Regions:
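Intrinsically disordered, low-complexity regions enriched in proline, serine, glycine
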Residues: 120, 194, 233-235, 245
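TPR/TPR-like (Sel1-like) alpha-helical repeat modules
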Residues: 147-154, 208-233, 237-240, 250-257
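N-terminal alpha-helical interaction modules that lie
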Residues: 1-147, 151-158, 162, 244-264
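Short helix-capping/linker turns of helical repeat alpha-solenoids
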Residues: 99-100, 157, 166, 173, ...
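Active-site-adjacent loop and "lid" segments of alpha/beta metabolic enzymes
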Residues: 190-211
Length: 264
């Protein structure tokens, strides 16, 4: 026990950095509740109006989810078609307010629900998606749209510097956007087989290998964790084989150097 406690704060920070490559004790996120809820819609009345429209659409989708799960009486015979109409309504809101990141994040989430997290790989079965018998061209367009929405949401909300503040609402949306993109990358990596070519020809991911999807998923999980999602933070290392291997090697070396007390 005494040997393990001889590690300095710097030693622990270095070891934590190996276990969590995105961690940095000097650059914690600065949350400021006095900032506008969305940095790109600073007029309170406009934000309230836009966010209410979004909430109404999201509530409608949540009610459809409950209907699909059998948790509430059916109010429509075509819940999936109504779900798609909700996505179209989000699209209209985004067209009117293209810099409203939350709507983009929610549209990406709805597209994941409809088309599944393996949407980048044509022909891969995903039992969790709502739509069946998907057309390859349609799925490719949707995959590009979902990733573009998440890219844009992340760009819109990411603080301009490591020491810039972010509002709680913007931080939550940013965390969700990183985590959603990570989920898509992670499921793509899990389903990736030799010969697979991601069906997003105009995007960088079209050239990625399985390991590149794994690494990108880990980075996004880490950033999702940095902005508040503890589950994403935990997944950051477990989904990165390089970090896992490195962490295991370092832990074994430290156990030999400092004794069993460093086991954790």
């Amino acid at each position: 026990m005494a040997a393990a406690s001889s590690l300095s704060r710097h030693d622990f920070n270095v070891l934590e950095k190996i276990k969590d490559p995105e961690s940095n004790p000097l650059t914690a996120v600065i949350v400021d509740s006095t900032l506008p809820k969305d940095p790109n819609i600073t007029d309170t009345s406009v934000y309230d109006r836009v966010s209410k429209k979004e909430r109404d659409i999201v509530l409608a989708m949540q009610q459809l989810e409950m209907q699909l799960a059998g948790l509430r009486p059916a109010s429509t015979t075509e819940p999936i078609e109504e779900y798609r109409q909700c996505v179209s309504r989000l699209g209209e809101l985004i067209s009117e307010y293209p810099d409203y990141a939350s709507a983009r994040n929610n549209r990406a989430q709805a597209l994941r629900r409809l088309y599944g997290d393996t949407m980048l790989l044509t022909g891969v079965h995903n039992p969790n998606r709502l739509l069946r018998d998907l057309d390859g061209a349609e799925t490719s367009q949707v995959a590009t749209l979902a990733l573009s929405d998440l890219d844009k949401a992340i760009t819109l909300l990411t603080p301009k510097s490591l020491f810039a503040s972010i509002s709680p609402q913007a931080g939550k949306t940013l965390s969700m956007a990183h985590t959603q993109r990570a989920a898509i990358y992670h499921m793509t990596a899990k389903s990736f087989q030799p010969g697979h070519v991601p069906s997003v020809p105009e995007r960088k991911e079209a050239e990625w290998t399985k390991i590149e999807f794994e690494e990108a998923a880990s980075r996004d999980f880490a950033l999702g964790g940095r902005y508040g999602n503890e589950i994403a933070k935990g997944l950051a290392v477990s989904t990165n084989p390089t970090a896992k291997l490195c962490g295991q090697m370092v832990r074994e070396a430290m156990k030999k150097e400092y004794g069993p007390a460093y086991a954790e």
